[in-house]
Design a protein with these regions (language model features):
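A short, N-terminal "cap"/entry segment at the start of jelly-roll beta-barrel domains
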Residues: 1-59
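Short acidic-glycine-tyrosine-enriched beta hairpin
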Residues: 96-134
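A short, polar/proline- and glycine-enriched secondary-structure boundary/capping micro-motif
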Residues: 104-107, 151-155
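Short coil/turn segments at secondary-structure boundaries
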Residues: 70, 98-99, 154-155
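Feature captures hydrophobic
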Residues: 47-49, 57, 72-76, 119-121, ...
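A short hydrophobic beta-strand segment most commonly corresponding to one strand
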Residues: 2-11, 128-153
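A mid-sequence, solvent-exposed acidic-amphipathic segment
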Residues: 57-81
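Short, conserved beta-strand element in jelly-roll/cupin
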Residues: 79-98
Length: 155
């Protein structure tokens, strides 16, 4: 499978584009209601499902972002959920930890436009604690892959 994002670099001014995004996308906290997202400059596009694949763009306006480490996705109770992130604009990093504590950081992958981090789930789709962190204001794409038998949620 492949995703092609046409025209992702076709804008005149990055700051103007990101301001337009903030004006049109709701905050991730307003959509998801997760306490770790409260008060953070983190915005999300409407999620689009194509079969078992979910696509959501996120605008990370706050530097640092501090969305908090997480490893579970409550909307998918079926084992086998997978997810990767692709940097679209700006610079960020995907951080992985052994515990829900940034002091246990064991891998930090810098991400530039067009880059997808390596899969961070094991053969049984278990995740480490992880978070996206900004280096600059950013837009990234989260691609969620549901296992067979899971029904895409209405988020």
């Amino acid at each position: 499978h492949a995703v092609i994002i046409e025209g992702f670099a076709a804008y005149d001014d990055e700051d103007t584009l990101m301001a337009r995004v903030r004006d049109s996308w709701p905050s991730a906290f307003d959509v998801r209601g997760e306490e770790r997202l409260r008060g953070i400059g983190h915005y999300m596009s409407p999620k689009v499902w194509v079969g078992q694949f979910g696509f959501t763009f996120y605008h990370a306006a706050t530097v640092p972002l501090n969305v908090g480490l997480h490893k579970d996705h409550d909307f998918c109770p079926v084992p086998g959920f997978r997810e990767v992130h692709t940097q679209i604009m700006g610079f960020g990093k995907m951080q992985q930890c052994t515990e829900r504590n940034i002091a246990t950081l064991y891998l930090e992958e810098p991400m530039a436009p067009g880059q997808t981090h390596r899969p961070m789930y094991d053969d049984e789709c278990n995740y480490p604690w992880h978070q996206f962190e900004t280096i600059t204001p950013s837009i990234f794409l989260a691609v969620e892959m549901l296992p067979e038998g899971a029904i895409p949620p209405n988020l």
